[in-house]
């Protein structure tokens, strides 16, 4: 079959700036891969991102709060009613903005026209497919580049047409000693098609803390690694940025140091007894901690604010409970 030759002059191409849903981790209109070993917190991390985006709250390293967005979330591993919705609610997501394509009569795959239909109908700015291998389609060998490449090319084209950021969640293979680029499950074409690749892992010294490290960024300088914690009592908590590398994450080695953790330790020391909000703010400035990081540390520790006379005081939650019992007539303000 003969195809008419058509040439495009680069002179006629109108340049465009890359648009970001979360700079520099999640570009609009492009594919992003989030990968890690099973049980390391990939889905938990993505659900936390969804929670912030649906509420219009800034993510780590973002200076301004974005407008709330709709999200399409497809999962083949977890139940919607008993797992995904409870986790979204625990993360504080606006569940009215999280939409799922009904697969009860026909399963989805990346070549399914319903994906783009859903994006156009809802105006969703993010689509998540978890895990990627479940959406390749029947008979597709994820290790064969000639089978994977055309599927990813179509998915990337859909993302570009709609301007939607697409996250593909995947597992790592079990091979040790390989470069991070070759630890992804399946063909290397998955990595090649993605403009951003994020790796999630935990540290051996503190298994409750997970690290998200950017392993690839084709559109901007690679972002800082981000720490988060899965706390049995307080749930998901962002713990700030750090200098740990992808290799540190994959090996579980390295010492975690972030401004958020530093401020949490300082607050626990300062607030053995209640301290004025002014004193806390001054101490944060001395340590070079931003007000936003300070507020994150305050939220993570559950610190309460009480007004005594004309001054505001900060105290740890257990101190706040005692204080309210003793001075019930003073108002409690957040």
Regions found by a protein language model. Name each.
Residues 10, 16-17, 21-23, 27, ...:
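Conserved inter-motif catalytic segment of the P-loop NTP-binding fold
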Residues 33-34, 39, 44, 71-74, ...:
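Phosphate-binding/switch region of NTP-binding enzymes
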Residues 54:
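Gly/Ala-rich phosphate-binding loop of Rossmann-like dinucleotide-binding domains
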Residues 1-12:
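A short, basic N-terminal segment
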Residues 5-7, 120-123, 161-162, 203-334:
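C-terminal regions of RecA-like/P-loop NTPase motor modules
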Residues 26, 73, 84, 130, ...:
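Conserved RecA-like P-loop NTPase ATPase core
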Residues 45, 49:
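Hydrophobic positions on the alpha1 helix immediately C-terminal to the Walker A/P-loop
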């Amino acid at each position: 079959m003969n195809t008419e030759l058509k040439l495009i002059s680069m002179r006629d191409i109108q340049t465009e700036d890359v648009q970001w849903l979360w700079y520099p981790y999640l570009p609009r209109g492009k594919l992003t891969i989030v990968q890690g070993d099973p049980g390391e917190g990939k889905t938990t991390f993505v659900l936390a991102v969804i929670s912030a985006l649906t509420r219009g709250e800034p993510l780590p390293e973002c200076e301004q709060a974005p407008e709330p967005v709709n999200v399409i979330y497809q999962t083949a591993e977890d139940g919607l009613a008993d797992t995904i919705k409870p986790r979204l609610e625990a993360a504080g997501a606006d569940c009215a903005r999280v939409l799922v394509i009904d697969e009860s009569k026909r399963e989805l795959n990346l070549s399914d026209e319903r994906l783009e239909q859903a994006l156009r109908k809802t105006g969703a700015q993010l689509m998540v497919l978890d895990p990627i291998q479940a959406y390749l389609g029947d008979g597709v060998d994820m290790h064969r580049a000639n089978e994977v490449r055309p599927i990813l090319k179509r998915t990337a084209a859909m993302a570009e047409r709609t301007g939607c950021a697409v996250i593909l969640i995947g597992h790592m293979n079990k091979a040790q000693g390989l470069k991070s680029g070759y630890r992804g499950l399946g063909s290397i074409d998955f990595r090649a098609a993605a403009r951003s690749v994020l790796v999630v892992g935990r540290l051996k010294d503190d298994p409750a803390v997970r690290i998200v490290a950017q392993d690839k960024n084709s559109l901007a300088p690679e972002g800082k690694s981000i720490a988060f914690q899965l706390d049995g009592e307080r749930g998901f908590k962002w713990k700030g940025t750090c200098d740990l590398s992808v290799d540190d994450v994959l090996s579980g080695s390295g010492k975690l140091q972030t401004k958020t953790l530093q401020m949490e330790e300082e607050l626990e020391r300062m607030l053995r007894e209640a301290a004025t909000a002014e004193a806390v703010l001054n101490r944060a400035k001395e340590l070079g901690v931003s007000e936003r990081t300070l507020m994150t540390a305050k939220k993570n520790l559950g610190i309460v604010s009480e007004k005594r006379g004309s001054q505001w005081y900060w105290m740890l939650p257990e101190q706040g409970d005692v204080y309210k019992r003793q001075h019930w007539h003073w108002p409690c303000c957040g």
